[in-house]
From Swiss-Prot:
GO terms for cellular component: apoplast; chloroplast; cytosol; nucleus. Pathway: One-carbon metabolism; tetrahydrofolate interconversion. Pfam families: FTHFS. GO terms for molecular function: ATP binding; copper ion binding; formate-tetrahydrofolate ligase activity. GO terms for biological process: tetrahydrofolate interconversion. It comes from Arabidopsis thaliana (Mouse-ear cress). Belongs to the formate--tetrahydrofolate ligase family. This is Formate--tetrahydrofolate ligase.
Length: 634
């Protein structure tokens, strides 16, 4: 066993998450780094229990062979969640503390909005958590704050540019963009050459431009109706979903309707998650499209001259944050993109660094948001395309509770007591719901990976119900199916899962297969994904048709697709449980995160700014003023 890992003594019943987290004294993060053989030159400390791992750590280990790569998805969940994060952490505790393997957990950074709202935190649960969990769930090392700042700088640049273009002639605008120096000479800043190149202007001096070229260069002529970029903040605030800006007396009546999204919905978060280097991040940030000109041309952050400044604000955020689990295994926390309008996976750079750190025979386990129809699909078709990495094993987390729901059980509603059907034995209801599990197994196997079903056991589950899930999983083609009790028993409760994962990784026989090639049309890619859901066809609204035509004309049809749909059904209708088929998938709109690198069709209506419930989680949260420890965080 490594020097940093430990085995917990557990008690029953399982205490509250925050009480368990506070009962374990974390190791100084330098001890975790030392156990991973990270040179102190390659990380920066953020207090005692967090460190930023620098990209230079990857550069130093480039010759090192990668470890095994494992992704954790799940069946179609209930609104309560089925424990993917807890299973991810529990598995890694089993691999590191009980099976003596080198392992790194790679997780998304949670938004503080849901932490204070209805969902609570995302550090795992019970005896399988990331600690300190209050630091994990709140500010961490400031990455989300950096995203908020850079996103809003770009938003300010957009409206400011419209304002100044409205009130100035072409010549006056150009003269202010390229002011003379003390010697009276004008010059272009470095970022301006990006726009000149885009316009096909090869001249290097402002004095050489013709009046027509001056107009093309200086006047972006942004169509306000086309602007898709919104301001963000990391708080659930429903009253900011739709606002009017520009109502001050100095703005000369230039009002515009817009709104706020939650920070993790920003395209900059998706860029952070999909970037592979600082240079790559600079290019992606500069290519972000904020809207169109009145002539229909895409306007980018680099056109506004702000791409470099955005990168400067994000320069520290590109480095993953090192933390630890309750049992002392290492965790890299990095990026937290939405799983609907974005791809819902932690960062590529964290995974790449982790795979080098664990080396041959080690394990990197990462979680994909929502069910495997969404999270694992996007992991394979978007994240793995850009990273060039290939997973050997995919886990599908299932619960008896969710399977009963898919078998026809009563609705599961967050905040309400569970119906008796979910806390008493009903094997036939479980078996009926296994059609959902079978669909997730077959979909995931199609990528060429070995699939393991991890049955996340609850105290009310019976042996007969658990055995039914295991049998059905094996009959459906799973490599293995394992019952886990890591929530109640820490890594010890996931040892069998760890053994199964090792066997699955050692016995991979197929290459990674994508669901679709990139060189087909946008509609063809959408329809390939819809078919994997069980749809018989796709129906496009007039708006969706218009957007697909626009993105194709603008040269973006070769990007992967990031479907934005409900996580509560394979279909577009959250009420359709099990494995619905033969439905027509409606595409309401199609939008693009061009800098991040994907097109996202909207299936139904998606909120990008959550609201607070009547009784938010913040009612439970307080601080012990004597010890400084947080109470009530979950």
């Amino acid at each position: 066993m490594s020097s940093s890992t430990r085995k917990l003594e557990v008690v029953s019943p399982v205490p509250a998450d925050i009480d368990i987290a506070n009962s374990v004294e974390p190791l100084h993060i330098s001890e975790i780094a030392k156990d991973l053989n990270i040179n102190p030159l390659h990380y920066d400390l953020y207090g005692k229990y967090k460190a930023k791992v620098l990209l230079s750590a990857f550069d130093e280990l480039q010759g090192q062979e990668d470890g095994y790569y494992v992704v954790v998805g799940g069946i179609t969940p209930t609104p309560l969640g089925e424990g993917k994060s807890t299973t991810t952490v529990g598995l890694c505790q089993a691999l590191g503390a009980y099976l003596d393997k080198k392992v790194v957990t790679c997780l998304r950074q949670p938004s503080q909005g849901p932490t204070f709202g209805i969902k609570g935190g995302a550090a795992g649960g019970g005896y399988s958590q990331v600690i300190p969990m209050d630091e994990f769930n709140l500010h961490l090392t400031g990455d989300i704050h950096a995203i908020t700042a850079s996103n809003n700088l770009l938003a300010a640049a957009i409206d400011t540019r419209i304002f100044h273009e409205t009130s100035q002639s072409d010549k006056a605008l150009f003269n202010r963009l390229c002011p003379p120096n003390k010697e009276g000479k004008r010059s272009f800043s470095d970022i301006m050459f990006r726009r000149l190149t885009k316009l096909g202007i090869s001249k290097t001096s402002p004095e050489e431009l013709t009046p027509e070229e001056i107009k093309k260069f200086a006047r972006l002529d942004i169509d306000p109706a086309s602007i898709t970029w919104r301001r963000v903040m990391d708080v659930n605030d429903r009253f900011l979903r739709k606002i009017t800006i520009g109502q001050g007396p100095e703005e000369k009546g230039m009002t515009r309707e817009t709104g706020f999204d939650i920070s993790v919905a920003s395209e900059i978060m998706a860029v952070l998650a999909l970037t592979t280097s600082l240079g790559d991040m600079r290019e992606r940030l500069g290519k972000m499209v904020i809207g169109n000109s009145k002539a229909g041309d895409p306007i980018t952050a680099d056109d506004l001259g702000v791409g470099g400044a955005l990168t400067v604000l994000m320069k520290d955020a590109i480095n993953p944050t090192l933390m630890q689990t309750l049992e002392g295994t290492p965790v890299l926390v990095h990026a937290g993109p939405f799983a609907n309008i974005a791809h819902g996976n932690s960062s590529i750079v964290a995974d790449k660094i982790a795979l080098k750190l664990v080396g041959p025979g080690g394990f990197v386990v990462t979680e994909a948001g929502f069910g495997s129809d969404i999270g694992t699909e996007k992991f394979m078709n978007i994240k793995c395309r850009y990273s060039g990495l290939t997973p050997q094993c995919a886990i599908v987390v299932a619960t008896v509770r969710a399977l009963k729901m898919h078998g026809g059980g009563p609705d599961v509603v967050a905040g309400r007591p569970l119906d008796r059907a979910y806390v008493s034995e009903n094997v036939s209801l479980v078996e009926a719901g296994c059609v959902n599990l079978a669909k997730h197994i077959s979909n995931t196997k199609a990528y060429g990976v070995n699939v393991i079903v991890a049955v996340n056991m609850f105290a009310t589950d019976t042996e007969a119900e658990l055995n039914a899930v295991r049998k059905f999983s094996m009959d459906a083609g799973a490599f293995d199916a394992v019952v886990c009790s890591h929530h109640a028993h820490s890594g010890k409760g996931a040892v069998d899962l760890g053994i199964a994962v090792e066997k699955a990784c050692q016995n991979i026989t197929q290459p990674l297969r994508f669901l679709y090639p990139l060189d087909i049309g946008i509609k063809d890619k959408i329809e390939a994904i819809a078919k994997s859901y069980g749809a018989s066809g796709v129906e496009y609204s007039d708006q969706a048709e218009k957007q697909i035509e626009m993105y194709t004309q603008q040269g973006f049809s070769n990007l992967p697709i990031c479907m934005s749909k409900t996580q509560y059904s394979f279909s577009h209708d959250a009420s359709k449980k099990g494995a619905p088929s033969g439905f027509v998938l409606p595409i309401r709109d199609v939008r693009g995160s061009i800098g991040a690198g994907f097109i996202y069709p909207l299936v139904g209506t998606m909120s990008t700014m959550p609201g607070l419930p009547t009784r938010p989680c913040f009612y439970e949260i307080d601080i012990d003023t004597e010890t400084g420890k947080v109470r009530g965080l979950s």
